[in-house]
Each structure stands twice: as C-alpha cells, then as structure tokens.
C-alpha cells in the first residue's frame, strides 16, 4: 500500500493560489522516480500473488517510434496496469526484433555495419519508449541480434533437427529479385514480396525447412480452443491458410511408365468426367515426361517452362487469364473406366498442390473447362445439377434394349462446352456407370471404396499449408548451426559449441547477389567436421527472423540465463501469455509459427501448454486523412512532435479514447489537445481536495459517492472487454461530477470529493500515468499509484434511485409508479397496463394507442367500442 506524505495535502498548503498543469514538468519529475523505484519489476521469488503475463508484440528497430507504436503500447499498458490494480503480479516485458532485411538494406544504403545501425536504433527507441512510460520491467529487455539470444535460436533449430522437423531439400521456392533472397509462402502477398512489394518469381534452390505440415491437423483443430479469446477474423485467416480438405488420392497409370501417378482430388465422384490430366510444368513429373517426348515437344515444353517461371503464382491461378499449355504426347489411364486420357503441362496447376498433377473434369470445374475449350478437349457431364442433391435416391431403370440408364425426367442440361460455364452445383451422378443416381456425398464414399478395394486409391487429406522455408541468403540473421562434410554429409554443431557467431561484416560485400554474403568469410566458413574431424564448411544461410519471434515470449522469463533458453519452472509460473497485443498484419506469419513452435516444445517436454497466447487483441492502424501515414503521401505525423506539443499522457489517452481498440484511428479526427484539457481538469480536482488522506468516506456527499462506486463497479468489466474508450468517457463523467460537487455542492472538504479524486487517480493511471502519479502525490501519498489495489464498490451505493413514472389515461393522471431509471419501454408499458387504477379507468373501452417515454411517462388513449 502506498504511504502518506507527512506534510499533508499539497492542496491545503496551496489554498486558492492559481495553478497550471505543466505536462513537461510533471514528466521530468516522475520519470527518474520510476527509474529508481522500479515499481514494475517482477523478480521477487517471495511474491505469491496470482500472475498475469501481458505482452506487446516487440518492435523492429527501424528508426524512432511512430504513431502505430504509440497506439499499441498505450493499449497494452492499460491492460498491464489494470491487472496490477486487481492484485496480480504482472510480467510486462519489452525487447527488439532486431535481425532482418530492413536493417541490412538500410545499412547497405548508408555504407554501415548492420550491427551499428541496429543498436543505434534500439538506443533511440529505448529512450523514446522510456519517455512514453509503459509499465515495462526494464530488467528483462532482450534484442534478438544479441548472441545471448540467437544462441537459443540455434538450440531450437537443433531440437527440431533431432526430431526430423528441420530438413534440407531442393525445390522451387519463392524468390524476391530485389532482396535477392527466398521467401516463405506466408511472406508472399498477392504475388509480391510482403517487405518490398516487388513481384515474386520462382527459383530452384536447396533450402532449409521446418516441417510445420506435420502439425497441420493440430494447428487447425486447436483453433477451437481460441474461439472467443482471439478475434474471429484471425481464426478464420488461419483456418483458410492451413486449408484442410478431404478427398482421395487416385492412382493413374501412365502409358510407358512403370510407376503410376497419384492425383489428389476432393471430387472422386467425378472420375467418369475426367477427359485429360494436367501436370504442373515446374514439377519433376512434367520434366520426366517431357524428357522422353519428341525433340520438338521437348523444346516447346522447355520454352513454356521458361515463360512460366517468370509468371507470379497469383497470375497462374487467375481465372481471367487465357489458358496456356503444352501437350506432352503422353497418356494416362482412368482407373475406373480404363479410358486413355491425354497429359498436358499447364501453368494453372501448381507443383506444390497435392502431388503436382490434377485430373481435369471440365464439365464441373471452371478452370478445367476454360482449358478444355482453349484446346478443344472433350467435355463430359457426369453430375446432373437439375436433379435434387438430397432426399430419396431415385430408382434408376435401364433401357431393356441398350442397357443405358433411364434417369428421371428433369430440365434439360445445358452443355458447358457451349455455355462456357461449368456445372459446379450439387446434383445426382449421370454417365457414371454403376454410380448413376448417387448424390455427391454418397458417390464420393462409394467411388473411394471402389478405388480402395482395387488398390487404385485411398481416402486422403490435403492442406494448403506448406512447410516453413526458414533459410535466407542474407547476412543479418541467425547462422544455421550445421556444417557440411563430404564424408559425413550434414553434421549439426554440438550444443557446447553454440552460439555460432556471425562473422564481422567488415570486408564482406553485403549487396544482395542471390547467395549469402557469409560464403565469402572463408575463415568462418571453413572448419573441421564435428563428426570425423575432416574438412567441412559451415552452412552459409541465415534463419528467417520469424524463427526469432516464434518463441521470444519464453525468453523473457529469464533473458539473462546463459545456461538454457528458458527455465521450465518459470514457464510453469508465467506462461502461456495471458494477454497478447499487436497488429492483425501478423495474423498468419508470426502467430502461426509461434503456435507451431509451442507445440513442438510441448511434444519435447519443455512446456506444459500447447498454445502460446491465451487472449489476443489486435489494435487498428493510426491513419491520417483516411490513409496510412507515409512520407510519400505527405501525411506523416511524427510521434515526437505530438509528445512535445501535447504531452505523453494526452497522446496515450487519445489512443484509448478514440474508439474501440480494434478500429482504425484517423488522427485528423481526434483531439490530443482536448485530452490535454481533460487531464488538466482532472489534475486540478486532486489539487483542490482539502480533506486529509485518512478521512472516513461514508459521511461524504451521497450523490457523488453513488457516481464513484458505480464507476468502480463497472470499470473492471469494461476493461476486460477492451472497452477502454467507454472507461474514459465514464471517467470524464466522474471528474465532472466531482468538479460540480467542489464548485457548487458540498465543497472541496467533503469526504466524497477525496474518495472520487482518489478513484479518478487510480483509473487515470491506466491511461495517463504521469498525471496520475502527480495527482497521487498531491493527494498526500507516496508513489506509486500503480501498486494501489482497486477499491471495492459499496453494494449499498449501487442500488439505483427510483424515479416516478406518471401514467395517464386519455390525458388524465391515473397512477404514479416507482421504477428504475433504466427501465425499458416495453417493461414500463407492461407495468402501466397492469396497474389496477389504469384497468379501472379503461374499463371496457378499447386501447387505441400507448405512448411511452421511459422512465417518466405513459400516455394511454382509448375509445368506445362500437
């Protein structure tokens, strides 16, 4: 509990002297006090209070803090400070996501070492962050570019490698020609690099992957645990990205090839409608089939493949583009019908979907139909979409002469080959032999059973999710702890040899060239094999920086421990994170990777939980004039200018009051100057209090006490529902009520005024800590108000005063009833209609209209019954 000043209240000494709210003076006064007191440290082993872990997504050190940072850290701090007031020990740390391309590119542009550039930016941001005053535990700071951190990235890599979850393979990868490095699928947005916005191409490289697809089912199914605790939009985005589908793997024999080709399909019921096969031109199967083709076919294929490699994935999947392809002059065999079908290579099939080959059913798939029409391939309808898809299965009779099925009469089917529109709706199978008349679900089951019985297929699942490509051809990242030995192959670096330090950048050409600059550091690259002692070379790629952030929440538990990544006992105490705050831009990348790594650590016994973040809050963006802020648009608002002009607390309060936290804030529409005026008004309330700190409040003004205690009762629910703007609005009402009591009511000496001022101060601490701390001192207490328990409301003060509702019948008052001021229109009308006085007055007359003005008036109009 905070201690009282021996000198009594500052306000009493000040008397009626005019005072001025000086935010700069207040900030200068309290920041060094907090630095000395460390009120937010969480290193006391004897602290047995319940715990909360509140974490903001850590920033990237590219320049100073901006308006987006200001919003995120203001909102996260509301939550951290709230839980401290609720009696919790709160872990609220901060660090820097310090590796990565932006720092490396900025350093190259300026001719600097990425280390110096990064650490200078961290120092600048740290100073700005301290000024902004989030309630961070500054003894738990980390930077991911420190060897003391990335040593444990390498440890994590080795743990995945031991379990076969980290592996290296050659494949077609996403390639950013500007940054000259590979990208994970999640880092490609609409065919462009999510960092530099350049078009992404494909390139065949040998790269390192994490086997996240092994966890696809769990990553999808465990989203159910997060329903209601994470934004629905984020959960939907992850579900769609993981993209589980069910169907069958169907084996198609290839004429002239010993091994069949597996084709994944969600619609095995349409097998009778397959008229050709399409393979991805950049797949190994296409290359193999083209290799055995005639020279002119092989040449056409190679020319086509070269063109495809210059096409973005988005363009390849577009339904608007003209379909292109090459006939490979090879044929496959339909496993159900025995029909020979031609094999084409076409760019609308991707090598990493299913098995890189599809069975084309042009009558019932639009892209297949577009391709079939472009190359005059047959179109066979096998689903009658005019037949009901559900209900009783129709009895299928056969023509006694031809043996052909006689289906129930229905509207004539239009030919997709003529209309250009595929029949994608539900219906009944036709032209499908023994499966005619079956609905989609029954046909899928029956066809799959038939394939399985003959060894030509089996039920299967497929995922949109691909393994996480984690190697990068750049300098500023975590070195991969593997050496390559001609005799032994891949050899992991022993844990005792970690960290594998980055070599100095001096002397290395960091300009992007498509290969890692580390390859030129010969003294660093060439080492002895840890297995046989022979010559070996270090792996020269560095890790994707999303590896760094996938587990950083655990490193905060003991960031200075050089013996382990984190202490499992501390993880039991603090983790998982109770409240995570950050932008929706990380809905897939960071959050999905963190969920994956957490499950890996769970499986290996390092943690006892499977989800890293219990509750997630995504804040909106800070805009200017309806657009994202940028120098090029000329609408950039500098945070430092706003802090200088209005003060830290006014900016923080504005961020919380502007609207629901998940909504965007347009800085042109808000008023930090208005926030500053409110803070001055609240601050003067504390200054004007003249009663002593130890007064008994019960004898204070009852009306003000009711306002105060209603605020005390309602605020916890509002904060926990993230309705920070509503809390601020209610706080303004409390300040106004207190001011009114001081100026025209019971006066500044009234005990209820002190109570209201103290509650105002505690609540204001959530949003404006400098002002709140100064108010707390003016009220006669020692710092810090942050550690003061939230007051419990008096239930007797929460009982609403009744109001008198007048009930009129035909303009005459017939009854008066005492009701709640919050009574609804329907409730008040029902109460009036049931009044005995009203019933007597109405008698047998007909009620024509009832006008209700809740909570004070009901007017009933009647007329004689004819």
Swiss-Prot record:
Residue window of motif 'KMSKS' region: 628-632
GO molecular function: aminoacyl-tRNA deacylase activity; ATP binding; leucine-tRNA ligase activity
PANTHER family to which the protein is assigned, alphabetical: LEUCINE--TRNA LIGASE, MITOCHONDRIAL, LEUCYL-TRNA SYNTHETASE
PROSITE patterns for the chain: AA_TRNA_LIGASE_I
Protein keywords: Aminoacyl-tRNA synthetase, ATP-binding, Cytoplasm, Ligase, Nucleotide-binding, Protein biosynthesis
NCBIfam families the record matches: leuS_bact
Organism taxonomic ancestry: Bacteria, Bacillati, Actinomycetota, Actinomycetes, Micrococcales
Composition bias, Low complexity: 404-418
An annotated GO BP: leucyl-tRNA aminoacylation
Region of interest: Disordered: 393-421
GO cellular component: cytosol
Catalytic reaction list: tRNA(Leu) + L-leucine + ATP = L-leucyl-tRNA(Leu) + AMP + diphosphate
Listed EC numbers: 6.1.1.4
Gene3D superfamilies membership: 3.10.20.590, HUPs, Isoleucyl-tRNA Synthetase, Domain 1, Valyl/Leucyl/Isoleucyl-tRNA synthetase, editing domain
Subcellular location: Cytoplasm
Protein family according to the UniProt entry: Belongs to the class-I aminoacyl-tRNA synthetase family.
Motif ('HIGH' region): 59-69
Entry binding sites for ATP: 631
Pfam families: Anticodon_1, tRNA-synt_1, tRNA-synt_1_2
UniProt protein name: Leucine--tRNA ligase
InterPro entries attached to this UniProt entry: aa-tRNA-synth_I_CS, aa-tRNA-synth_Ia, Leu-tRNA-ligase, Leu_tRNA-synth_edit, M/V/L/I-tRNA-synth_anticd-bd, Rossmann-like_a/b/a_fold, tRNAsynth_Ia_anticodon-bd, Val/Leu/Ile-tRNA-synth_edit
Organism of provenance: Leifsonia xyli subsp. xyli (strain CTCB07)
Main location, first listed in the record: cytoplasm
